[in-house]
Amino acid sequence: MSEIDVEIVAVEREIWSGKATFVFTRTTSGEIGILPHHIPLVAQLVDDAAVKIEREGSDDLWWAIDGGFLSITDTKVSILAESAQARADIDEAKAKTDSGSEDPRVAAQGRARLRALGQTV
């Protein structure tokens, strides 16, 4: 199966990079699924985005993304975020608490983490 290079970069450093067969996330224009050889595109991610990365022969990866942009070329997907948190590092109780915050930014971060955990918000 064909693969595409994927990188998740936060303000301070590269968070993750590797190969994927499919990437799924939400932009301000709607949901997007990306396969290798996708048309070039730049899009703004929603504030409470979760990113799913499917890899051949490996478990899917989920990331909670705090705002940012998505850049797609024929061979690469770049996710440029203010911050990103892997599913394995998410504290579910804190994410639930944060999702109910009166601060819109904190609430968006909480929702993104819950989505990365596979919960419907």
Swiss-Prot record:
Pfam family, one: ATP-synt_DE_N
Gene Ontology MF terms in the entry: ATP binding; proton-transporting ATP synthase activity, rotational mechanism
Signal peptide: none
Location in the cell: Cell membrane
Main location: membrane
Keyword entries, A-Z: ATP synthesis, Cell membrane, CF(1), Hydrogen ion transport, Ion transport, Membrane, Transport
Its membrane topology: Peripheral membrane protein
InterPro entries found in the cross-reference section: ATP_synth_F1_dsu/esu (IPR001469), ATP_synth_F1_dsu/esu_N (IPR020546), ATPsynth_dsu/esu_N (IPR036771)
GO cellular component: plasma membrane; proton-transporting ATP synthase complex
Reported function: Produces ATP from ADP in the presence of a proton gradient across the membrane.
Complex and partners: F-type ATPases have 2 components, CF(1) - the catalytic core - and CF(0) - the membrane proton channel. CF(1) has five subunits: alpha(3), beta(3), gamma(1), delta(1), epsilon(1). CF(0) has three main subunits: a, b and c.
Homology family: Belongs to the ATPase epsilon chain family.
Protein name: ATP synthase epsilon chain
Organism of origin: Mycobacteroides abscessus (strain ATCC 19977 / DSM 44196 / CCUG 20993 / CIP 104536 / JCM 13569 / NCTC 13031 / TMC 1543 / L948) (Mycobacterium abscessus)
Gene for this chain: atpC
